[in-house]
From Swiss-Prot:
Pathway listed: Protein modification; protein ubiquitination
Reactions listed under catalytic activity: S-ubiquitinyl-[E2 ubiquitin-conjugating enzyme]-L-cysteine + [acceptor protein]-L-lysine = [E2 ubiquitin-conjugating enzyme]-L-cysteine + N(6)-ubiquitinyl-[acceptor protein]-L-lysine
Keywords: Endoplasmic reticulum, Membrane, Metal-binding, Transferase, Transmembrane, Transmembrane helix, Ubl conjugation pathway, Zinc, Zinc-finger
Sequence intervals crossing the membrane: 24-44, 60-80, 157-177, 183-203, 224-244
Compartment(s): Endoplasmic reticulum membrane
Function: E3 ubiquitin-protein ligase that plays a key role in endosome organization by retaining vesicles in the perinuclear cloud. Acts as a platform for perinuclear positioning of the endosomal system by mediating ubiquitination of SQSTM1 through interaction with the ubiquitin conjugating enzyme UBE2J1. Ubiquitinated SQSTM1 attracts specific vesicle-associated adapters, forming a molecular bridge that restrains cognate vesicles in the perinuclear region and organizes the endosomal pathway for efficient cargo transport.
Record's keyword annotation contains Transmembrane helix: yes
Gene Ontology CC terms: endoplasmic reticulum membrane
Protein name, UniProt field: E3 ubiquitin-protein ligase RNF26
SUPFAM superfamilies the UniProt entry points to: RING/U-box
Subunit structure: Interacts with INCA1. Interacts with TMEM43, ENDOD1, TMEM33 and TMED1 to form a complex capable of modulating innate immune signaling through the cGAS-STING pathway. Interacts with UBE2J1; this interaction is important for SQSTM1 ubiquitination.
One Pfam family of this chain: zf-C3HC4_3
Claim: Cell cycle is one of the keywords in the record: no
Length: 424
């Protein structure tokens, strides 16, 4: 057993020895192979490593060089900037000194100027106050005269419009009656002319029937007029009684009636039509005068007379006043614009001849006092702000009805802002 045990131990030792030898062999071979591999890798990577090292070395050198150059440049730029700031501060100080000098000289000049101006203002203050007081008094007097004239004109125009309205209403009421009587008369004349024999035979019954109709019509008309008169008197008495007994209620009823009447659009249309109808005769009469005077001015060279010469004037003016109703507004405006120029040209042409005769000089002076448009009325309206006294009241009203951009002075063509009536 001991021999077997020894054999087994010997075999184990041998195996252990072989294992150790194999491990040593593997360790040596693996170390040798690793060394060879590292050597080959080192040899293979040596150029790249050298180049990379040189590249990093060059890059570091360049960066350090650039940093050095940048530091030098910044130092130089900072020095130059500091020098420029110092120079600019010196220049600013010089400019401030210069500005102070200019300011001192300007202050001295302005103080001297203010002193001179104050002395002049103190000298001229009294004269200016006196002139302003005179101007204020003149303006106040002009405004008072203008207000009084405006009130008088408003009263006259209102009275004229009222009478024109009454005449128009009277014409509107009596016109249909007259036309009806004309139609009845024409109808009766036609019947009488077509049946003369029958009228002769039936004259007595027809006469009786006509007398009966006439008496009935007179009776009916008298009854109607009597009753209407009674109703009107009764209404007047009732109105007076109501006004005396209940003035507040009457005033309230009148106010309500007027408000309801003003609320109706037909009332405004009727009022506008009445105003237009009342203005129409005035406008036609004024345009007739303008047109007749323009025709008279145009016919002066053909007649060979002076302004105001009586040769055939009334007939021509009368015949010319019948036609201007159909003239368009453009022709009327053209007449207004050209009439003063023609009048002035004719007056200038006749001036040498008139200078030799006192009668002609007197006529020329009277013509100069006439309106430059119609040459019929005297100049009574002063145009502002040009201060030309060249128009009458009627022509001024016609001119002021035009748009604002057409309201120009006939002499200087400046815009008319205001008119002032002048009493010579």
């Amino acid at each position: 057993m001991e021999a077997v045990y020894l054999v087994v131990n010997g075999v184990g030792l041998v195996l252990d020895l072989l294992t150790l030898m194999l491990d040593l062999n593997f360790l040596l071979v693996s170390s040798l192979l690793a060394t060879l591999a590292w050597l080959l890798a080192f040899i293979y990577n040596l150029p790249h490593t050298v180049l990379t090292s040189l590249l990093h070395l060059g890059r570091g050198f360049l960066l350090s060089l650039l940093a050095l150059v940048e530091a030098v440049v910044r130092f130089t730029f900072g020095g130059l900037q500091a020098l420029g700031t110092l120079l600019y501060s010196c220049y600013s100080g010089l400019e401030s000194l210069k500005l102070l000098g200019h300011l001192a000289s300007h202050g001295a000049l302005r103080s001297r100027e203010f002193l001179n101006r104050g002395i002049l203002n103190m000298v001229s203050n009294g004269h200016a106050l006196l002139r302003q007081a005179c101007d204020i008094c003149a303006i106040a007097m002009s405004l008072v005269a203008y207000v009084i004239n405006s009130l008088v004109n408003i009263c006259l125009i209102s009275t004229q419009n009222f009478f024109s309205l009454v005449l128009a209403l009277w014409d509107a009421v009596t016109g249909p009656l007259w036309r009806m009587t004309d139609v009845v008369a024409a109808f009766l004349a036609h019947i009488s002319s077509s049946a003369v024999a029958m009228a002769i035979l039936l004259w007595t019954p027809c006469q009786l029937a006509l007398e009966l109709l006439a008496s009935a019509a007179r009776l009916l008309a008298s009854c109607v007029v009597f009753h209407l008169t009674g109703l009107v008197l009764l209404a007047c008495v009732l109105a007076v009684i109501l006004i005396v007994l209940h003035p507040e209620q009457t005033l309230r009823l009148a106010t309500q009636a007027l408000s309801q009447l003003h609320a109706r659009p037909s009332y405004h249309r009727l009022w506008e039509d009445i105003v237009r109808l009342t203005r129409l005769p005035l406008g036609l009469e004024a345009w007739r005068r303008v047109w007749s005077r323009s025709l008279q001015l145009a016919s002066w060279p053909n007649r060979g007379g002076a302004p105001g010469a009586p040769q055939g004037g009334p007939r021509r003016v009368f015949s010319a006043r019948i036609q201007p109703q159909d003239t368009p507004p453009e022709a009327e405006e053209e007449v207004i614009r050209t009439a003063p120029a023609r009048g002035r040209e004719q007056l200038n042409e006749d001036e040498p001849a008139a200078g030799q005769d006192p009668w002609k000089l007197l006529k020329e002076q009277e013509e100069r006092k006439k309106c430059v448009i119609c040459q019929d009325q005297s100049k009574t309206v002063l145009l502002l702000p040009c201060r030309h006294l060249c128009l009458c009241q009627a022509c001024t009203e016609i001119l002021m009805r035009h748009p604002v951009y057409h309201r120009n002075c006939p002499l200087c063509r400046r815009s008319i802002l205001q008119t002032l009536n002048v009493y010579l």
